[in-house]
Amino acid sequence: MYSKSRKIQSVVVMLAFMILAASAWGGAPARAESGVSEPYRIVALGDSLTAGYEHGYTEKSVPYGYVEQVYEQSLFHGLRAEYVNYGILGLKAEGLNRLLEAVSGGRTVKADDIQKELQDPRKETLAAQTAQMAKSIRSASLIVLTIGGNDLLPVMTKLDSGATAEEITTYIQTILDQYEKDLEASIRTIAALNPKAQMVMSDQYLPVPAPLQFGSTTIELYPEAKRKLLLDGVTKLRGKLELVSTRLADDGIKLQVADVSSLFVGHELEYTSIAQGDIHPNHLGYAAMGRAFATAIWGDYRTIRPRQANVQMSVVVAGKELPASAAPPVLRSNRSFVAMRDITDALGAKLTWNNATQSATVSYNNHTVILAIGSAYVTIDGKKVKLTTPPAFLLKSGKESKTYLPLAALSEALGLQVTYRGTLQTAFINK
């Protein structure tokens, strides 16, 4: 896959990179207290695929790429997760290696010290973050990575120059030999900084579709001879990844390879913006990448159940969605409320109801929380605190009335992580 816009004949044309918003740790930070799990920290490194770039993005765009989907999958698995994304548009393997050398050596660098003519408008800001990158990598539980598409970028120019197939093949081999060296050096640097982190990177997909067949008529969207040469390059890049992974394994360093390329075969027009002249994935393509990474990391890809039209959101507690029999969650003033018994059962918390005071006492994880219907205050471990949400309330559900509690206020008071993902319309509660 070529992680930079470039000229392709017919429908495939040049498109310049646009600005992505800077990334920082995502998700709520874990609270340092007894009984609370250590955070599951995800660090993302690499090129524009890691940055989550899509066709038409501007500096105000919020990425929703494979990294964000890996983060969501970690929440689905009951992990108290957070993430940081250091993806740089236009980055090549050599640039990644230089960046990581600076990170490891504790040096502050400028963008040109990493790679000349980087296309990312955030390049100086990102290059200056070597100290933060080192801290992030050292504390990471999982490191995800994409790199290689930009290394093959010069092949397009070579193809347009009229070079022979033999010359192109030799040229690709030269590029990939250097790619192999830079990639291995990068992974070894990461492993030296954090030998315990799980490392997963993807292979590269080819965005150029095969010829379309309509009866006896064949339509080439791109010259087939050239497409096959590009496909050969992508295939050989996968081979280099496997060679590096094998050598690293011999030294006790595990690098997993997520199979992205096969998922795009036959879906190039569906999963990318190639018809608009941009080779980057669209939301469907990034979802496919997310599935590939999640499968490599956890062995599955999780989703929520389809919601009925009257259900505003879903709730996942410690990796399990509230059962279909649970009362539907309710949104009030953009805050989530759940039926009292449903959430306490899901947590395994002790619940006591005081009918006289119309209050619920929830005990869990060495915390005791008291919420009263209509009260603007909550009592947390004996201390009265003003709610920042609407108060608990009664709501008729079928033939009975149910007590609804403010989800975030209750969960945070119990020392839990609460994360709402608008992309999924789902609240995740993790220990």
What is the meaning of each model-derived region?
Residues 2-32:
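Sec-dependent N-terminal signal peptides of Gram-positive bacterial secreted proteins and lipoproteins
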Residues 41-46, 50, 82-87, 141-146, ...:
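Structural recognition of the beta-strand scaffold that forms the well-ordered cores
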Residues 89-116, 271-280, 366:
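Charged, often glycine-rich, active-site loop that binds/positions anionic groups
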Residues 25-32, 291, 295-431:
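Primary recognition of N-terminal secretory signal peptides and signal-anchoring hydrophobic helices
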